[in-house]
Swiss-Prot record:
The gene is CIN1. Its EC number is 3.2.1.26. Expressed in roots, leaves and flowers. Weakly expressed in seeds. SMART domains: Glyco_32. This is Beta-fructofuranosidase, insoluble isoenzyme 1.
Amino acid sequence: MGTRLLALAPWLLLLLLQLAGASHVVHRSLEAEQAPSSVPASIVSPLLRTGYHFQPPMNWINDPNGPLYYKGWYHLFYQYNPKGAVWGNIVWAHSVSQDLINWIALEPAIKPDIPSDQYGCWSGSATILPDGTPAILYTGIDRPNINYQVQNIAFPKNASDPLLREWVKPAYNPVATPEPGMNATQFRDPTTAWYADGHWRMLVGGLKGARLGLAYLYRSRDFKTWVRAKHPLHSALTGMWECPDFFPLQAPGLQAGLDTSVPSSKYVLKNSLDLTRYDYYTVGIYNKVTERYVPDNPAGDYHRLRYDYGNFYASKTFFDPVKHRRILLGWANESDSVTYDKAKGWAGIHAIPRKVWLDPSGKQLLQWPIEELETLRGKSVSVFDKVVKPGEHFQVTGLGTYQADVEVSLEVSGLEKAEALDPAFGDDAERLCGAKGADVRGGVVFGLWVLASAGLEEKTAVFFRVFKPAGHGAKPVVLMCTDPTKSSLSPDLYKPTFAGFVDTDISSGKISLRSLIDRSVVESFGAGGKTCILSRVYPSMAIGDKAHLYVFNNGEADIKISHLKAWEMKKPLMNGA
């Protein structure tokens, strides 16, 4: 016990400091304001506020910014409105953690207070310099009304402070400004910089003309004076690239990560596409001589590999030097209305941090919740070798499932009963899922109903649908979907189906699924993290202990629950809430 208390001492001290200055962190009561009569009571229920996903106590949150590890602490900065539950008044809020799960909020790190950011401090990244000092590159808005964008830099005021509580902005800001011919309103979100051949390099997202999204490349010898290269690192006719990210990968199948400046034979280039609000990436080669990035798949910019096929945007990765891994963070907005958000008093969460690495095939990334999440696991139940017949469902009982972690290995017999894939859908997984939702019976379709009411009036389906191989010798096509169309009886909710194809061979009949259920968010990982889907849902009946969990089979063949284990999840320290 003594060792445990010593380990907790830094946390307890910081928690006391936060409570002593709580007025700086929690801007008003956690009780929502008087809700208009048009807002359902369930929407403002505290039981719909997430239990273990990252969020501040109140108000608006969006992009994760500048994650880093420094002197024993993980730091996360994020776009935050301290004055309300809608976008605006953006500052860089700041939280710290020793495990990426329990978080304590500090004072905002970066606020509009110099000419080159006086109208906004937008997204950016952190870079650890050779002497160990962190530097933040971020976008500033320096003119009213037109969102004229420039890039700024900030350094810790006191590098000996492990909490990095104060930041200073040199007088030479801004360090990069739009040049003639560049769209100054589409020039933002600098990346973590990398160092090679005597130069630092960073990317800034941009748009040329109406359609050409690009990653501007900048170089600097001293991290102070930045010069734009003659050509971008990469570009494609996709629309504006927000929040670009560029990082090296280990060899296929190796789960360790690499620092951004370590050279590699494979890289990821990711962009957050402003037109669709999804995060896309490619795996490819970085030619250090020509300073160009080339995707392995020539059509990769348009085939649209995504980190997450659901509600997940403006993501950022960083290298964790403690566990030698690359960690992915992303933002999930609400799927209710602005009226509802104002009534709740809060809007937005971050996804659970994920470890990312290159699949053994070398074609895509794999993602998995960081291992620290398992420290929140509590009471559990297990199910073995349970057969679920066609048209039937099986309830998992013995624990609360509104805040849970569920891992299930499933086997399906009778793959010959799978439907043929209509070529009219092409590679449009979302449209296919919309047409072939969870309640469409036949073929091979099975999965979980989560946050379900006792009478199944409300339920969110996370499931697989299998289609026959497209040709001789081909493997069956596996579609993974989250279908929230029956997730709530409340009106005025956005309830889209989300879907992605799973690049796995189900010929053996085996597939796995993990779902993180957290009151108003369902975050799922198919086939060991090949396909991931996050969805926001707002049950009106399936709340708290009235939420249930089922395994369902709406196909024509038996399925077997080889092994299911579900855990209740405890609430971590979460920014004083």
